[in-house]
């Protein structure tokens, strides 16, 4: 039976009695239903023109599809299909709501079947049916449908919820002012090639099913809400078309409190600890998409957890995937990135690339073994760390596409798990700071930034060299550079307090304070810089040529200064340029004589000698003018980059520091780095 409209109407028409009686209702304007407490199942339908408001304290279940529209005078929205051969739909100036669910009331579409939706579908939209009947939800809207459906434009502050395991599909198209909570128990398509989705005011989504983000061609979609999960098995799938990007700025967390309306986690540490029956296991599948975690304004990582609580799959679909980390502070990825199926993420390597964006403060730690076949790019200004107190980390390097492009800073700080890296390029810095050994292997190690060993061992193997590295620094006594059988060829600078295991050939700048366990050869274009302690060579031959630089030795030298402590048995061969055995050297107003047979018979030692008045004009102090070549030892700080890169650069461009000797008008030599006599 269909109820007849009244002859006159003052305010909204109340059809509660008709609904409770199961009668069909024809709308002729604004209409209300007051639902009593408990559950009311309505087997009738709504039709006509008007609006429907559901209020009260109970639940109204619709079992049949209803079709009505707003009065023509209130229709204003414009629906456009654009994109040519790749069509997508946009809605501008949306109509006011045709359905309103007031606070305290619950409207349920369907009862576990395929019918029960309110909607009008006049648009010939591609691949989905756009609903003209927009809805405002300040109470609760429950979607108990197995079919595919669309709700038009959604507003309000309430709860929209799906029961679990129905596997209906909600096509959530367009931009929605809704600011409440979405409880996805089944499947939400938040974007497709045919539409983009924007939810700028949504605070939280409780994801207990599959939440899929997709885009039309050439569109950037941002999801700024936090996602929560309560049960094992939920995931977020991300897809995108060529030229598109999906930006996720919130966090995907477990929830142990707050129910459906305000999910939250009592302790963030619970994301990193397996719960009973793994109910806090959640994941994301990136399917040939360009995905960015963060937008440079937050330091909450999207997927907090370990391999036991989260999974991350980087997959190829139409194209390889790209995952960018863009944060403004330190974040830790405690789980591996793989390419398996759902929870079995390590069944196959990931198919995509990873970027650490060059946002100021972006400092990302990988605290797990990564397993993706692709490039890892650290942009200028960014930091990527492998390993932390939460666990050791590494990059998989066995795939054909595996490589590291480092224009920022790459830090390896594993406690116990060795790391091997090959194909490392870029202009950025490399830092070894963990107890476990890091190995650079192969001829693909070509980066040009500074190499710093703070702790543990950095090893070079299979043809890897540091000839392009701007500076090599061993900043602690426990720092160790293992150069293997090939030895280390220094073409830039080598400084610090640590040990080089293997032979060193100096064609650049080497500073005292280091220990070399193999031989030490300094060629004609090399320079040895005297520091507070001598260069120690504990094994192998010592062959000298090139320059000795005393400008960093201080202004109050001892009467006897050891420049090179040759702890081997063989004689020191060769001599510094212009400093044959017994030659005089003046610095800090003191004349010293050099010997290559000092100490235990083969050390290079400077011994103070009495200054003769006639010789005084010939000895200019080496620490005179404040040029790079005459900096004191206190200015060469191991905690920073040091000043030797600038020394080397100045040398390459302008004759290398201060000339070893210069002639006066009378043709006599005066001291530069050193003044030699004999």
Q: Model-derived features: where do they sit?
A:
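Extracellular, surface-exposed repeat/solenoid domains
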Residues: 278-279, 524-608, 649-651
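Cleaved targeting-peptide boundary
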Residues: 10-17
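Extracellular repeat-rich scaffold modules on cell surfaces
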Residues: 23-114, 145-206, 215-306, 317, ...
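C-terminal low-complexity, Ser/Thr- and acidic/Pro-rich disordered "stalk" regions positioned immediately N-terminal
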Residues: 597-639
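C-terminal membrane-anchoring or membrane-association module
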Residues: 642-678
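C-terminal segment of classical bacterial N-terminal signal peptides
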Residues: 1-8
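Generic detector of short, aliphatic-rich beta-strand segments that form the cores of beta-sheets
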Residues: 107, 142-143, 211, 323, ...
């Amino acid at each position: 039976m269909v109820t007849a409209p009244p002859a006159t109407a003052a305010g909204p028409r109340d059809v509660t009695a008709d609904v409770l009686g199961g009668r069909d209702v024809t709308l002729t304007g604004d209409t209300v239903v007051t639902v009593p407490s408990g559950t009311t199942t309505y087997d009738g339908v709504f039709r006509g023109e008007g609006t429907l408001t559901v209020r009260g304290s109970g639940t109204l279940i619709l079992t049949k599809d209803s079709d009505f529209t707003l009065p023509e005078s209130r229709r204003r929205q414009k629906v456009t299909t654009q994109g040519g051969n790749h069509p997508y739909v946009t809605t501008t100036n949306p109509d006011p709501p045709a359905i309103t669910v007031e606070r305290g009331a619950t409207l349920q579409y369907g009862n576990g079947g395929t019918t029960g939706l309110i909607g009008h579908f006049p648009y010939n939209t591609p691949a989905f049916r756009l609903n003209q009947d927009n809805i405002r939800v300040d109470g609760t809207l429950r979607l108990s449908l197995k079919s595919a459906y669309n709700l038009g434009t959604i507003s309000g502050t309430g709860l929209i919820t799906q029961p679990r395991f129905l596997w209906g599909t909600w096509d959530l198209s367009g931009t929605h002012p809704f600011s409440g909570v979405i409880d996805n128990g089944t499947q939400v398509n938040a974007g497709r090639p045919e539409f983009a989705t924007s939810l700028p005011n949504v605070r939280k989504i409780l994801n207990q099913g599959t939440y899929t983000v997709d885009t039309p061609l050439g569109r950037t979609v941002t999801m700024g809400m936090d996602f929560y999960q309560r049960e094992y098995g939920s995931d977020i799938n991300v897809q995108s078309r060529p030229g598109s990007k999906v930006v996720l700025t919130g966090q995907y967390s477990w929830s142990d409190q707050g129910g459906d309306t305000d999910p939250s986690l009592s302790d963030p540490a619970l994301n990193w600890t397996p719960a009973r029956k793994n109910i806090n296991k959640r994941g994301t599948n990136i399917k040939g998409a360009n995905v960015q975690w963060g937008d440079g304004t937050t330091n909450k990582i999207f997927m907090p957890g370990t391999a036991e609580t989260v999974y991350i799959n980087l997959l190829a679909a139409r194209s390889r995937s790209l995952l960018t980390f863009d944060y403004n502070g330190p974040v830790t990825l405690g789980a591996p990135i793989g390419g398996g199926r759902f929870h079995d993420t390590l069944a196959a390597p990931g198919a995509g690339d990873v970027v650490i964006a060059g946002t100021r403060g972006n400092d990302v730690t990988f605290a797990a073994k990564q397993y993706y076949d692709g490039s890892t790019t650290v942009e200028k200004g960014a930091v990527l760390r492998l390993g932390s107190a939460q666990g050791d980390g590494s990059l998989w390097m066995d795939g054909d596409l595996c490589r590291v492009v480092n224009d920022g800073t790459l830090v390896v700080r594993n406690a116990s798990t060795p790391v091997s890296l090959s194909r490392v390029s870029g202009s950025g810095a490399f830092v070894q700071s963990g107890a476990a050994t890091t190995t650079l292997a192969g001829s693909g190690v070509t980066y040009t930034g500074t190499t710093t060993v703070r702790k543990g061992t950095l090893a070079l193997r299979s043809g890897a060299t540091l000839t392009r590295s701007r500076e090599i620094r061993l900043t602690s006594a426990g720092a160790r550079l293992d150069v293997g059988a090939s030895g280390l060829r220094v073409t830039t600078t080598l400084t610090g307090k640590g040990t080089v295991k293997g032979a060193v050939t100096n064609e650049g700048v080497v500073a005292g304070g280091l220990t070399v366990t193999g031989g030490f050869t300094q060629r004609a274009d090399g320079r040895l810089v005297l520091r507070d302690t001598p260069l120690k060579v504990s094994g192998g031959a010592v062959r000298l040529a090139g320059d000795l630089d005393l400008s960093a030795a201080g202004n109050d030298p001892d009467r006897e200064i050891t420049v090179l402590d040759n702890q081997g048995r063989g004689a020191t061969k060769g001599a510094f340029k212009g400093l044959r055995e017994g030659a005089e050297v003046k610095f800090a107003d003191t004349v010293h004589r050099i010997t290559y047979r000092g100490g235990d018979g083969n050390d290079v030692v400077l011994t103070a000698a009495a200054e003769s008045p006639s010789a005084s004009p010939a000895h200019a102090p080496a620490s005179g003018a404040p040029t790079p070549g005459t900096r004191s030892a206190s200015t060469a700080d191991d905690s920073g980059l040091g000043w030797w890169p600038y020394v080397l650069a100045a040398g390459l461009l302008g004759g290398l520091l201060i000339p070893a000797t210069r002639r006066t008008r009378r043709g006599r030599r005066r001291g530069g780095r050193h003044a030699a006599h004999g």
